[in-house]
Amino acid sequence: DTKYHEKACGIPSYNLDPFMASEQHMREVYVSHAKDADVCIVEGMMGMFDGYDRSKGSSAEIAKILNLPVVLVVNAKSAAYSLAAMIKGYLDFDPQVEVAGVIFNQAGSDRHEEMLREICDDLNVPCLGCLRKFDALKEESRHLGLDFSRKDEDGITETLLKQLDAQLNLDFLLQITRREVDVTTEVKKNVSLSGNIWVARNKESFSFIYAEHLDYLNQFGTVTFFDPEDNSAVVPDNVDLLYLPGGYPENRALQLSAAPRVIDSVKDHIERGGIAECGGMMYLASELVMCKDPYTAFKMVDALPMKVSACKDDMRLAMGYRSFDFRGVKLRGHEFHYSRIIDQDEKLASAVQVYNAKGHPVNTAVFRYKNLIASYTHLYWGETGIWSLFEQVPGE
């Protein structure tokens, strides 16, 4: 859900995750982008202390690793002074986490706002503002995140900026959260090679790409984006690596199947050197099944002997961190999908055992077919790299 950030700032957001990357790598990523910035915002995920193992991997841990203050955003809907007990708990739970101030969300009236500000006065913590309920900013959700398809993003961004400026004390917020960036942290220098790398990307079916991955790939050559829904976007013969990231192919199955020239070119080249993650892997199946009664399916690339079902009857949430060792490289990532593999050829087996965040085995498959690597897992290779995964490095 980083599309708001990119729309408002004009630059992509980067991933900071203590499960998927080392503390040193997180510092390098943060410093490399913070050293020339005026303002840096690290958005927390879930609750402040929610991690993959108690508070490990939580927003609180990231704040400690990067030495950043925390602005606590509190949902004040249908609540008032009872929130004081909760906020007090956040303030005292971990003395190493600095809570710089509080923003209340969904305040209902002037009197409600007055009551909320009294909480901060009594707890001696700055109140940075109270955001009122505002239906125009309410976003619909869908099974894998926020749904931006029905909104005018330009209008939303402008409206949001006006509301924040009116209801938050932005100058004070920037003042009390100001910190020096540790520019002594060494940032690895990029290398420069001349590979030819093609990446599937559009607004829907191939829309989930870590910005770090694009930075990484750009070190190894020229990155060209293509839209698999565009039948003229045929993958050329001289491509060294084909990257099919995640997205919502189930929402665009008809459009994907209606581009047979692209399908044929992807099938011809993906085996030479390719990575397919989640939606990208679904695209490589023989069919994407949308309904079983009546049977409705769309032809996909057919590089992997299996089908993928996005039928309501088959949909089950698979979510969580994943890790595995492959060819001497420890890879980590995240899995989040509802579709599932069906009619899998018995010869198509996982190349490795995959584990969850606590080290317990899960049935997520990592397919190794010729020089293709495919899985439901969105891998993070901003730190580990990917070239050692291939039996033959693409392009060599």
Each language-model region and where it sits:
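ATP-dependent carboxylate-amine ligase catalytic core
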Residues: 1-66, 74-98, 110-114
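C-terminal and late-domain segments of enzyme folds
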Residues: 6, 170, 190-193, 207-216, ...
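Short, surface-exposed amphipathic charged segments that create phosphate/polyanion-binding patches used
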Residues: 30-31, 137-152, 238-243, 320-322
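Structural motif
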Residues: 41-43, 71, 75-76, 103, 105-108, 198, 200-204, 376-380, ...
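Internal gly/pro-rich beta-alpha loop/helix module
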Residues: 81-189
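Phosphate-binding active sites in nucleotide-utilizing proteins
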Residues: 195-200, 204-268
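Cysteine-nucleophile active-site neighborhood
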Residues: 249-323
